[in-house]
C-alpha cells in the first residue's frame, strides 16, 4: 500500500486524485491533505478518507474544520497557514506527495517533500518553471522520483519507457489550441472572461484555463519538459491538436514516433503516476477509434499568441527569467480574472516585465521568491492595482 499526501486536495487535480484513490482503496491510503478555504469539501474528505493531518490556509475555514473534528472527536490534526504545507509535504509515513496547488507557492513544499525523501507526483508545473535546475538537483541528491501528472508530460513519460533519453530527436508537445484557436489579435481584443473560461476540451481550474487560452500553459509546459526530460528547447516542438486525443509524442533518432493517446480525463495520468511503475486496470473508458474524429495537427500561431514565444525565450535565457515570466503571468491572469484588464493585456504585461528585469544566475529558493515579489511590486506600481 502507498501512503499519499495531497497539497491542494479540494481543487480540480486534488479532487480527481481522490477519485483515483477511492477507486483503488486497497492500494492507497490518504494520510495528509491541504486546501485553501473550501472547508465543506475538506470535511467530506475527512469523513471519507480519515487523513491524519489537515491544513487549511484560511483561518475561518481552519476554525470550521477544527470545530468539526472536535465535535466528532476525531484524532485528525488540524493546522492553519501556508507554513503548515511543509508538514503535509514531509509527513512522516507518506510515500508520495501530489503537488496540485496552483502557482509558485508550491515551490517550498515541493523542496521540503524532496528533502524528506518523498516521491513527487507533480501537477504544480510552476515549481519546475521557476526552479527547474534547483528542484531536479535536489531530487537527484535525495534519490526522489519526479512523476509528471499533467496529461502531456505524463504522455511523454510513458512514451519514454524502455527507451533512452539520449536517443530522443524531438519531443512533440500537443496543445488543443484553446478556445481562441484561429482568431486574430484584433479579435482577441474583444473576448470576454467567460469566453476565455470556456475551454473546448478540458475542465480545469480558472487560472490554468486562462493560461490555456493564452497558450502560456503550453509555454510553461515547454519549460517543464526541458527539466523533466533533460531535452534542449530546440528539440521541444509544440503541435496544435484540436481533438486532444494524442496527448504528446516522442520522435527518436531513427525517425520513429511513439505517441500516447487517450480520453481527456486527468485521472488517467494521475493513476499512472501514483501506481508507477505498475500499470493498473483502467479507471476511464478508452478511446473508441471507430467514433474518433480525424486527427489534425498544425503549427501554433506565436505571433498572435505571444505568450508561447515569450516562454520559449525565457526558458532559453535561463536563470531568473522563467521566474519573472511566471510571476508576471500570475499577476496578469489574476487581473484578467477580476475583469481589470483585457485578454490581450496579459501578454503585454509579461513582455514588459521580461524587458524590465536583468537576468540572474546561481539561484536559490530565496532568490527566486524575492525576485518574484519584486516583479509583482513593479507591475503593481506601473499598472496601479
UniProtKB/Swiss-Prot annotation:
GO molecular function, one term: NADPH binding
Domain of life the protein comes from: Bacteria
Annotated catalysed reactions: 2-C-methyl-D-erythritol 4-phosphate + NADP(+) = 1-deoxy-D-xylulose 5-phosphate + NADPH + H(+)
Keywords: Isoprene biosynthesis, Manganese, Metal-binding, NADP, Oxidoreductase
Enzymatic class: oxidoreductase
Cross-referenced NCBIfam families: Dxr, PRK12464.1
Entry EC number(s): 1.1.1.267
Binding site for Mn(2+): 150, 152, 221
Database matches in Pfam families: DXP_redisom_C (PF08436), DXP_reductoisom (PF02670), DXPR_C (PF13288)
Cofactor: Mg(2+); Mn(2+)
Function noted in UniProt: Catalyzes the NADPH-dependent rearrangement and reduction of 1-deoxy-D-xylulose-5-phosphate (DXP) to 2-C-methyl-D-erythritol 4-phosphate (MEP).
Residues that coordinate or bind NADPH: 10-13, 38, 124, 126, 205
Binding site for 1-deoxy-D-xylulose 5-phosphate: 125, 151-152, 176, 199, 212, 217-218, 221
PANTHER family assigned: 1-DEOXY-D-XYLULOSE 5-PHOSPHATE REDUCTOISOMERASE (PTHR30525), 1-DEOXY-D-XYLULOSE 5-PHOSPHATE REDUCTOISOMERASE, CHLOROPLASTIC (PTHR30525:SF0)
GO biological process, one term: isopentenyl diphosphate biosynthetic process, methylerythritol 4-phosphate pathway involved in terpenoid biosynthetic process
Pathway involvement of the protein, from the record: Isoprenoid biosynthesis; isopentenyl diphosphate biosynthesis via DXP pathway; isopentenyl diphosphate from 1-deoxy-D-xylulose 5-phosphate: step 1/6
Keyword Metal-binding: yes
Name of this protein: 1-deoxy-D-xylulose 5-phosphate reductoisomerase
